[in-house]
Amino acid sequence: LMIRRPPRSTLFPYTTLFRSPGFDDDAFAVLSQKKNRILLERQPGDLPKSTVRSALNGYLVQARDNGMEAAGAWTCTTATARPESAEDLLFALKLVKHTKSNTVVFAKNSQLLASGTGQTSRVDALKQAVEKAKNFGFDLNGSSMASDAFFPFPDCVELAADAGVVAVIQPGGSINDEKSIDACDARGLAMYTTGVRHFRH
């Protein structure tokens, strides 16, 4: 998508590079105010169809995870639906797909607020993300959260609700899905499932 509306420069204090198919005049004027910031115009290209990883004395060639589930394919599993959060949920889902597992991502107003990455448990990834948001002074109230794989226990959504998250997206598929759904219902969160995990190691 071309960047058309001029974002407030204060929203991106640490962003040094923006890549977009285009920038309108207002967006360019705002984004170019920061010294040494790079604005790169580039049309999207085709992604590789496979990935290659070294494995001991050989290589592992596997299909690349190029898919992304559209909002119309999601299932709302809770009593509360938040269609107004769909844009942030999709944005968070795209980010979490490219982050090392176990991982969760918080997003609001199409901005990454924090991510917890590469943890041995999902709840540790969530705690890491909450702590990062606090350290940067980012308010998680009204934010959306994406997880690269299912929640094994309801503690993740409970902690997310305590942090201010209002909507969650995850693949689903845990034997404890109902417990996480019940925890969301008890706290007024919306939960969407995609049926597809984006596990990355």
What would you call each of these model-derived segments?
Residues 2-6, 11-17:
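Short, small-residue-biased leader/transition segments that mark boundaries at the very start
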